[in-house]
Amino acid sequence: MIDGVLEIVDKHRPLHLSIVGGDPLVRYREMETLIPLILEKGVHIQLVTSAFRPLPEAWASVPGLNVVVSIDGLQPEHDERRKPATYERILTNIQGQNVTIHCTITSQMMRSDGYLERFLQFWTPRNEIKRVWFSIFTPQRGDSMEEILTPSERKQAVADMLSLRERHPKLDMHPKMIAEYLTPPESPESCVFSMTTKTISADLTTLITPCQFGGDPDCGSCGCIASAGLKAIADHKLGGMVPISAIFKASIAIGRLVSGEERPPVPQKAEFPILR
Protein backbone atom coordinates (compact mmCIF):
# COMPACT_ATOMS: atom_id res chain seq x y z
CA MET A 1 0.00 0.00 0.00
CA ILE A 2 2.79 2.45 0.88
CA ASP A 3 4.59 1.95 -2.43
CA GLY A 4 1.32 2.26 -4.32
CA VAL A 5 0.41 5.60 -2.74
CA LEU A 6 3.90 6.98 -3.29
CA GLU A 7 3.71 5.92 -6.93
CA ILE A 8 0.44 7.84 -7.32
CA VAL A 9 1.95 10.92 -5.67
CA ASP A 10 4.99 10.78 -7.95
CA LYS A 11 2.77 10.35 -11.02
CA HIS A 12 0.29 13.15 -10.34
CA ARG A 13 2.52 15.50 -8.29
CA PRO A 14 -0.35 17.02 -6.28
CA LEU A 15 -0.03 20.10 -4.12
CA HIS A 16 -2.44 18.55 -1.62
CA LEU A 17 -3.42 14.98 -0.74
CA SER A 18 -6.49 14.07 1.31
CA ILE A 19 -6.66 10.62 2.91
CA VAL A 20 -10.26 9.78 3.84
CA GLY A 21 -12.57 6.95 4.93
CA GLY A 22 -13.54 4.40 5.81
CA ASP A 23 -10.97 5.47 8.37
CA PRO A 24 -7.27 5.77 7.56
CA LEU A 25 -6.36 4.88 11.15
CA VAL A 26 -7.47 1.31 10.49
CA ARG A 27 -4.07 1.21 8.75
CA TYR A 28 -2.34 3.37 11.36
CA ARG A 29 1.05 1.67 11.07
CA GLU A 30 1.15 2.37 7.34
CA MET A 31 -0.02 5.94 7.97
CA GLU A 32 2.81 6.56 10.43
CA THR A 33 5.29 5.44 7.78
CA LEU A 34 3.59 6.99 4.76
CA ILE A 35 2.86 10.51 5.98
CA PRO A 36 6.51 11.60 6.52
CA LEU A 37 7.43 10.19 3.10
CA ILE A 38 4.71 12.22 1.38
CA LEU A 39 5.54 15.38 3.32
CA GLU A 40 9.17 15.05 2.20
CA LYS A 41 7.88 15.47 -1.36
CA GLY A 42 6.42 18.87 -0.47
CA VAL A 43 2.80 17.68 -0.54
CA HIS A 44 0.35 19.00 2.06
CA ILE A 45 -1.69 16.21 3.68
CA GLN A 46 -5.18 16.22 5.14
CA LEU A 47 -6.14 13.06 7.00
CA VAL A 48 -9.81 12.61 7.91
CA THR A 49 -10.59 10.28 10.79
CA SER A 50 -13.24 9.47 13.37
CA ALA A 51 -10.45 9.38 16.00
CA PHE A 52 -11.60 5.94 17.13
CA ARG A 53 -8.02 5.24 18.18
CA PRO A 54 -5.31 7.50 19.68
CA LEU A 55 -3.55 9.77 17.22
CA PRO A 56 0.25 9.39 17.06
CA GLU A 57 1.82 11.87 19.46
CA ALA A 58 4.12 13.28 16.76
CA TRP A 59 1.17 14.34 14.60
CA ALA A 60 0.40 17.20 16.98
CA SER A 61 3.23 19.29 15.56
CA VAL A 62 3.96 17.99 12.05
CA PRO A 63 4.17 20.88 9.54
CA GLY A 64 2.03 20.28 6.47
CA LEU A 65 -0.31 17.78 8.15
CA ASN A 66 -3.92 18.65 8.97
CA VAL A 67 -5.81 16.01 10.95
CA VAL A 68 -9.58 16.42 10.58
CA VAL A 69 -11.91 14.68 13.03
CA SER A 70 -15.43 14.03 11.72
CA ILE A 71 -18.18 14.70 14.25
CA ASP A 72 -21.83 13.96 13.50
CA GLY A 73 -23.41 16.64 15.65
CA LEU A 74 -23.84 16.83 19.42
CA GLN A 75 -23.06 13.87 21.65
CA PRO A 76 -26.45 12.06 21.67
CA GLU A 77 -26.74 11.98 17.87
CA HIS A 78 -23.05 11.41 17.25
CA ASP A 79 -22.64 8.56 19.72
CA GLU A 80 -25.66 6.74 18.33
CA ARG A 81 -24.35 7.03 14.78
CA ARG A 82 -20.59 6.65 15.29
CA LYS A 83 -20.12 3.95 17.94
CA PRO A 84 -17.42 3.00 18.90
CA ALA A 85 -16.01 6.45 18.02
CA THR A 86 -18.01 8.14 20.78
CA TYR A 87 -17.44 11.63 22.18
CA GLU A 88 -15.74 10.11 25.22
CA ARG A 89 -13.31 8.14 23.09
CA ILE A 90 -12.59 11.05 20.76
CA LEU A 91 -11.82 13.39 23.65
CA THR A 92 -9.38 10.84 25.02
CA ASN A 93 -7.75 10.10 21.68
CA ILE A 94 -7.12 13.74 20.68
CA GLN A 95 -5.50 14.80 23.94
CA GLY A 96 -2.39 16.84 23.26
CA GLN A 97 -3.22 17.08 19.55
CA ASN A 98 -3.97 19.99 17.22
CA VAL A 99 -6.96 18.99 15.12
CA THR A 100 -9.69 20.39 12.92
CA ILE A 101 -13.27 19.44 13.79
CA HIS A 102 -15.58 18.90 10.83
CA CYS A 103 -19.35 18.54 11.06
CA THR A 104 -21.87 18.09 8.25
CA ILE A 105 -25.06 20.08 8.82
CA THR A 106 -28.28 18.12 8.35
CA SER A 107 -31.94 19.06 8.29
CA GLN A 108 -32.40 17.49 11.73
CA MET A 109 -29.82 19.90 13.16
CA MET A 110 -31.49 22.93 11.59
CA ARG A 111 -34.82 21.96 13.12
CA SER A 112 -33.27 22.33 16.59
CA ASP A 113 -32.85 25.99 17.57
CA GLY A 114 -29.28 26.96 18.38
CA TYR A 115 -27.85 23.57 17.44
CA LEU A 116 -24.78 24.89 15.62
CA GLU A 117 -23.93 27.28 18.42
CA ARG A 118 -24.21 24.54 21.04
CA PHE A 119 -21.85 22.46 18.92
CA LEU A 120 -19.33 25.29 18.79
CA GLN A 121 -19.71 25.99 22.50
CA PHE A 122 -18.70 22.40 23.23
CA TRP A 123 -15.72 22.09 20.88
CA THR A 124 -14.10 25.50 20.43
CA PRO A 125 -12.94 26.07 24.06
CA ARG A 126 -10.77 22.94 23.94
CA ASN A 127 -7.04 23.44 23.49
CA GLU A 128 -6.78 20.51 21.05
CA ILE A 129 -9.10 22.21 18.56
CA LYS A 130 -7.44 24.65 16.18
CA ARG A 131 -10.48 25.20 13.94
CA VAL A 132 -14.01 24.03 13.15
CA TRP A 133 -15.50 23.53 9.69
CA PHE A 134 -19.13 23.01 8.67
CA SER A 135 -20.27 21.33 5.47
CA ILE A 136 -23.89 20.87 4.39
CA PHE A 137 -25.30 17.43 3.63
CA THR A 138 -24.99 16.62 -0.08
CA PRO A 139 -27.50 14.12 -1.51
CA GLN A 140 -27.43 12.11 -4.70
CA ARG A 141 -29.93 13.17 -7.36
CA GLY A 142 -33.33 11.68 -6.66
CA ASP A 143 -32.66 11.11 -2.95
CA SER A 144 -35.41 11.93 -0.45
CA MET A 145 -33.42 11.49 2.75
CA GLU A 146 -34.33 13.13 6.04
CA GLU A 147 -30.88 14.75 6.22
CA ILE A 148 -31.47 16.95 3.15
CA LEU A 149 -31.93 20.61 4.01
CA THR A 150 -34.89 22.52 2.61
CA PRO A 151 -34.08 25.79 0.79
CA SER A 152 -35.14 27.79 3.84
CA GLU A 153 -33.01 25.62 6.14
CA ARG A 154 -30.00 26.11 3.86
CA LYS A 155 -30.47 29.89 3.98
CA GLN A 156 -30.77 29.74 7.76
CA ALA A 157 -27.64 27.58 8.04
CA VAL A 158 -25.68 30.14 6.04
CA ALA A 159 -27.04 33.01 8.14
CA ASP A 160 -26.18 31.12 11.32
CA MET A 161 -22.61 30.41 10.20
CA LEU A 162 -22.04 34.03 9.20
CA SER A 163 -23.22 35.16 12.62
CA LEU A 164 -21.46 32.44 14.61
CA ARG A 165 -18.04 33.07 13.06
CA GLU A 166 -18.09 36.52 14.70
CA ARG A 167 -18.58 35.00 18.16
CA HIS A 168 -16.51 31.87 17.66
CA PRO A 169 -13.21 32.69 15.89
CA LYS A 170 -12.33 28.99 15.61
CA LEU A 171 -15.14 28.66 13.07
CA ASP A 172 -12.51 29.17 10.41
CA MET A 173 -14.64 29.85 7.34
CA HIS A 174 -14.42 33.03 5.27
CA PRO A 175 -17.77 34.80 4.74
CA LYS A 176 -17.46 34.43 0.97
CA MET A 177 -16.94 30.69 1.36
CA ILE A 178 -20.01 30.39 3.57
CA ALA A 179 -22.09 32.42 1.10
CA GLU A 180 -21.16 30.01 -1.70
CA TYR A 181 -23.38 27.38 -0.05
CA LEU A 182 -26.30 29.39 -1.49
CA THR A 183 -25.00 29.19 -5.07
CA PRO A 184 -23.27 25.83 -5.55
CA PRO A 185 -21.93 24.82 -8.99
CA GLU A 186 -24.60 23.58 -11.38
CA SER A 187 -22.61 20.54 -12.51
CA PRO A 188 -19.23 18.82 -12.09
CA GLU A 189 -18.13 20.56 -15.30
CA SER A 190 -18.59 23.95 -13.64
CA CYS A 191 -17.17 22.91 -10.24
CA VAL A 192 -13.59 24.07 -9.75
CA PHE A 193 -13.03 21.46 -7.06
CA SER A 194 -14.22 18.65 -9.32
CA MET A 195 -12.11 19.95 -12.19
CA THR A 196 -8.91 20.31 -10.18
CA THR A 197 -8.95 17.10 -8.14
CA LYS A 198 -8.67 13.39 -8.78
CA THR A 199 -10.27 10.90 -6.38
CA ILE A 200 -8.88 7.36 -6.25
CA SER A 201 -10.42 4.50 -4.26
CA ALA A 202 -8.63 2.31 -1.73
CA ASP A 203 -7.58 -0.15 -4.42
CA LEU A 204 -5.33 2.68 -5.72
CA THR A 205 -6.69 2.11 -9.22
CA THR A 206 -10.42 2.86 -9.47
CA LEU A 207 -11.27 6.50 -10.12
CA ILE A 208 -14.25 7.89 -8.21
CA THR A 209 -16.16 10.29 -10.44
CA PRO A 210 -17.35 12.96 -10.95
CA CYS A 211 -15.98 14.10 -7.58
CA GLN A 212 -15.30 12.62 -4.16
CA PHE A 213 -19.02 12.00 -3.58
CA GLY A 214 -19.14 9.55 -6.47
CA GLY A 215 -22.25 8.40 -8.27
CA ASP A 216 -24.62 11.16 -9.39
CA PRO A 217 -24.42 13.94 -6.80
CA ASP A 218 -27.10 16.61 -6.67
CA CYS A 219 -24.79 19.52 -7.46
CA GLY A 220 -27.59 22.03 -6.91
CA SER A 221 -27.67 20.89 -3.27
CA CYS A 222 -23.89 20.59 -2.86
CA GLY A 223 -22.59 21.39 0.59
CA CYS A 224 -18.94 20.42 0.10
CA ILE A 225 -16.68 22.82 1.98
CA ALA A 226 -13.83 22.30 -0.49
CA SER A 227 -16.08 23.09 -3.44
CA ALA A 228 -17.40 26.21 -1.69
CA GLY A 229 -13.89 27.36 -0.81
CA LEU A 230 -12.51 26.99 -4.32
CA LYS A 231 -15.62 28.55 -5.85
CA ALA A 232 -15.17 31.58 -3.59
CA ILE A 233 -11.63 31.94 -4.92
CA ALA A 234 -12.70 31.33 -8.52
CA ASP A 235 -15.46 33.94 -8.31
CA HIS A 236 -12.99 36.61 -7.17
CA LYS A 237 -12.14 39.09 -9.93
CA LEU A 238 -8.54 40.20 -10.42
CA GLY A 239 -8.47 43.96 -10.70
CA GLY A 240 -12.24 43.85 -10.37
CA MET A 241 -12.51 42.57 -13.93
CA VAL A 242 -11.12 39.09 -14.71
CA PRO A 243 -12.59 36.22 -12.64
CA ILE A 244 -10.00 33.76 -11.39
CA SER A 245 -12.27 30.98 -12.68
CA ALA A 246 -11.26 31.90 -16.23
CA ILE A 247 -7.61 31.34 -15.32
CA PHE A 248 -8.48 28.04 -13.63
CA LYS A 249 -10.35 26.78 -16.68
CA ALA A 250 -7.68 27.87 -19.14
CA SER A 251 -4.97 26.20 -17.08
CA ILE A 252 -6.98 22.98 -16.80
CA ALA A 253 -7.70 22.92 -20.54
CA ILE A 254 -4.04 23.41 -21.39
CA GLY A 255 -2.99 20.73 -18.92
CA ARG A 256 -5.42 18.20 -20.38
CA LEU A 257 -4.36 19.06 -23.90
CA VAL A 258 -0.69 18.54 -23.06
CA SER A 259 -1.30 15.31 -21.14
CA GLY A 260 -3.89 13.92 -23.55
CA GLU A 261 -6.26 13.38 -20.62
CA GLU A 262 -10.00 13.39 -21.23
CA ARG A 263 -12.54 14.13 -18.55
CA PRO A 264 -14.52 10.94 -17.70
CA PRO A 265 -18.28 11.09 -18.33
CA VAL A 266 -20.65 11.61 -15.42
CA PRO A 267 -22.07 8.21 -14.39
CA GLN A 268 -25.79 7.65 -14.77
CA LYS A 269 -26.28 6.18 -11.32
CA ALA A 270 -24.48 6.03 -8.00
CA GLU A 271 -21.53 3.67 -8.10
CA PHE A 272 -19.41 5.03 -5.26
CA PRO A 273 -21.72 6.66 -2.68
CA ILE A 274 -18.95 7.60 -0.24
CA LEU A 275 -18.23 10.24 2.35
CA ARG A 276 -21.70 11.58 3.20
What is each model feature region?
Residues 1-58:
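Conserved alpha-helical substructure of the radical SAM core
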Residues 10, 41, 65-194, 235:
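Radical SAM enzyme [4Fe-4S]-AdoMet core and its adjacent flexible, acidic
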Residues 14, 83, 125-128, 149, ...:
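Generic surface-pattern signal
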Residues 21-24, 105, 109, 212:
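Short loop or secondary-structure boundary microenvironments that flank
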Residues 26, 54, 76-77, 231:
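Short glycine-rich, flexible loops that bind phosphorylated cofactors or substrates
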Residues 52, 74, 215:
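A generic "binding-loop/recognition-motif" signal
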Residues 187-276:
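Flexible mid-to-C-terminal extensions adjoining Fe-S/redox cofactors in radical SAM and related proteins
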